[in-house]
Amino acid sequence: MPYDKKPKMILFDVGGTLFAGGNFSARNGLAALRLAALNPQDTTDDKLALLWDEYSEKIGGGHKSPFGVTLDFPLSGALRYITMNAGLRFDISVAEQEEIFDRYNSDRKVIKGVTELLKTIHSLSIRAAIISNNAMSSEGLGLAIKHWIPEENMEFYLTSSDILLTKPCADIFTTAANYAHLNPADCWYCGDSKRPDVDGAIGAGMTPILLDVNSSAPYEYRTDADREYLVINHWNELTQHLKKHF
């Protein structure tokens, strides 16, 4: 089994994997961003919310490449459109603006077991990184993860908006492996969704681990189209697996 071979790197999804979030509110995120501007008095939260809706309507969603790959649009584009049209000025980077918007647009908590898992990975000299279907830039997402998990030790962050391509497209996985100078076979990928995370990782040659918090079995193997993959219902299970085998 590939799970008995020590990986050189373990990569993670973000939403539903590292964090559990509540309902999304663009208005709340934009309100916090307005207060971070040098001239917050020049516009209102209502104006920013209207600009968000206007931009979203113009851009639309579900865009695909000629090869059928769903494409992502960067959050930075939306924030620039909104804040510039509102006349807001900042003395912080766009990545910092992304992080503020992200921090306040929903309730969020770190999923149980994540911090201990990351400490264990680091103690075993296994490298760690992020691959996420995320509108944030890698720089913005890195700031966000560092805010919620100060002790995180990710080597790098790769988001779909960085390269436009989204999971389960194999290219986003192989891009990360190439950047790490690793063979995909030496990498594990952890996520909470079957198609983008498990199917995507397998398609790229990585070893997937699925977090299914609704599973009654703490640790099991599932098979799909003759492909077996590990499923756990708590990150503590992976922590114990790593400590036991490596």
Regions found by a protein language model. Give the residues of each.
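Asp-based, Mg2+/Mn2+-dependent phosphohydrolase catalytic module
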Residues: 1-12, 20-22, 38-46, 109, ...
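N-terminal helical cap/lid subdomain that shapes the substrate entry/recognition surface
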Residues: 3-124, 138
